[in-house]
Amino acid sequence: MEDEGFVDDDFIDDTAREFVGRYGIASLAVLREHAAIAEAAGDYLLAQMWREVVEAAERMLT
């Protein structure tokens, strides 16, 4: 994601780790909801960031 130039990988991983630590497997649903809310509000960059966090959380949980 760092290549795209808007949020660095450490932030994505740290955020995913925080959600996984707090919510466990349920973090995926919580994070997907954040992405959906951002997209519904028209904030596509924020929605993309949340989707990246979902992917990082999925990697941590597998």
Identify the residue ranges that each predicted region occupies.
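Long, non-catalytic architectural segments outside compact domain cores
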Residues: 1-41, 45, 52, 59-62
